């Protein structure tokens, strides 16, 4: 009898112990293998009917949440209380072979009710437009993202990210695990239908968060086999972060998943959590089995679902077209008329590595320009207009309208654009050699431009201006021609860029006078006096540009000797003495004398005070190609519009002026000799 009683007691103890392993819970730690009796609060699509925690199913645009019912207490006076450790096994089954739904996340939240906070699709059922990126949200999540989207800016559709109060991850990486034998990370498809282990460990004292992944052995072992045996030594993500600034005193832990137009079944097969220490290792042999793959539906049900879907899409299309027509004027009409490719913000964010400073190519009056690389490998330059730029939108519209359809080998091509939440971004061809200004005036280049390279650049810019003035369907006035706006490609060909001040108009229509904009030294007399902008004002600026390239000097240089401060005036004085070539850049030892004289005289012709006496861009190109001889100005007189700039203006010049603090003097120059 005693033996029987002892046996009963023994098996009773074992039963209690096993029950504890299957469903062990206290306020600060618990382990679940079968979720049917787990102390969880479920909403949305989430259910535990078959043992595993089933977060999402084959429902479109839905969410599923599951939170441990007992709150976790985090005490501000004890940093160790913020330490926690959790591990869980998940499996995601896509309903279509190549599409994977939107993913899931482990969440620590001040509330168990995320139904009003979290939207579906790319927000993973956690965030929405109202609470995204708000410090008052107090949400921490580790996301397992299985679908590339334009909201979260993470990796490319199979990544793990750390989210703090926003769907935009503070750190993310392609899903993978460290293989010690191979000494490298091995890619790990998240939506493969296979079981995957995740460890999330946070040290509240050191303030370090580690996220580690590993595949689970299949089929399950018959005897106990613990997760600690397969945990990689190197975490996938490791980040210093102070969660005491994020967590409130009471938080809930759980999971969130979502679907959009793409559906998937998401399961949690086992879960262990502990506050203030290491979570109990999961026994792989005790994990819940994921259900079999979804069954094929009878033809009748398939047809019914298809008809319903078509009806829904048709109705949605009608509503979309109705709203599109109703709000057409709100959608910016110019965007339809001038429509280069539109990029998602996520793609540009990835391409520029989050607009990091080490990707910065330069900054101007309206914004910063960053280098980027698209997924295709194409290098781009992304101009991001400042939020507080008063003319930001106006400049953006001008560049889109002007550049979107312009095509010329000597123009920097606008590849596309992006508008998101007030952000203005323009995407251009990347010019690996930077601006011409860098080569002419900065010593950080490996070598100077040769004479033939400079001549080729001048001809290229002239060809681009001829296209803008005469060959495109409208007249395009660039209004800011200068060396810093000429970019150089890999072969050092010059390309005209930065259309931020550009204006375009139909042929035969004269533009009204406008506010004076441009750069000192490049602005024609009639522009500064009356605000008149024509192709002749572009020609005047091109003349200043020619002299700038040939002489290696800026049109106005406050650091030059007094007689050389105004470049066109100095060239004129040298012309009087039959010494034009004395003005050629001293770094050029291989220049061709006659070619240099032609360019200098052409620059002077473009600088005449009377716009009617300046040549057109077509004539200029004919002079440059040698098809027509330059007028014999060396034997006549030329009235030049030379800036009469005060010393104060010279020393306080700005790159782009809204007003011109100088006048022009009519100087008659007599050229003699060669």
From Swiss-Prot:
Region Legume-lectin like: start and end of each range? 28-274
- Give the superkingdom in one word: Eukaryota
> Which SUPFAM superfamilies does the entry mention?
Concanavalin A-like lectins/glucanases, Protein kinase-like (PK-like)
Report the membrane topology from the UniProt record: Single-pass type I membrane protein
What region holds the Protein kinase domain?
Answer: 355-633
Identify the residues that bind ATP: 361-369, 383
Residues spanning the membrane: 302-322
Keywords carried by this UniProt record: ATP-binding, Cell membrane, Glycoprotein, Kinase, Lectin, Membrane, Nucleotide-binding, Receptor, Serine/threonine-protein kinase, Signal, Transferase, Transmembrane, Transmembrane helix
The active site of this protein is located at 480
- Read off the CDD domains from this record: lectin_legume_LecRK_Arcelin_ConA, STKc_IRAK
The answer on whether this UniProt entry bears the keyword Transmembrane reads: yes
* Pfam families referenced in this protein's UniProt entry, alphabetically: Lectin_legB, Pkinase
Q: Where in the cell is it found?
A: Cell membrane
Q: Spell out where the chain is glycosylated.
A: 57, 117, 133, 185, 210, 242
One GO MF term, please? ATP binding
> What is one GO cellular-component annotation here?
plasma membrane
Q: According to the UniProt entry, where is the signal peptide? A: 1-24
Catalysed reactions, as listed in the record: L-seryl-[protein] + ATP = O-phospho-L-seryl-[protein] + ADP + H(+); L-threonyl-[protein] + ATP = O-phospho-L-threonyl-[protein] + ADP + H(+)
Q: Which PROSITE patterns match?
A: PROTEIN_KINASE_ATP, PROTEIN_KINASE_DOM, PROTEIN_KINASE_ST
Q: Extracellular face: residue ranges?
A: 25-301
Q: Which SMART domains match?
A: S_TKc (SM00220)
Q: Which residues lie on this side of the membrane: Cytoplasmic?
A: 323-674
InterPro entries (UniProt xref): ConA-like_dom_sf, Kinase-like_dom_sf, L-type_Lectin-RKs, Legume_lectin_dom, Prot_kinase_dom, Protein_kinase_ATP_BS, Ser/Thr_kinase_AS
The UniProt family comment states:
In the C-terminal section; belongs to the protein kinase superfamily. Ser/Thr protein kinase family. In the N-terminal section; belongs to the leguminous lectin family.
Q: What is this protein called?
A: Probable L-type lectin-domain containing receptor kinase II.1
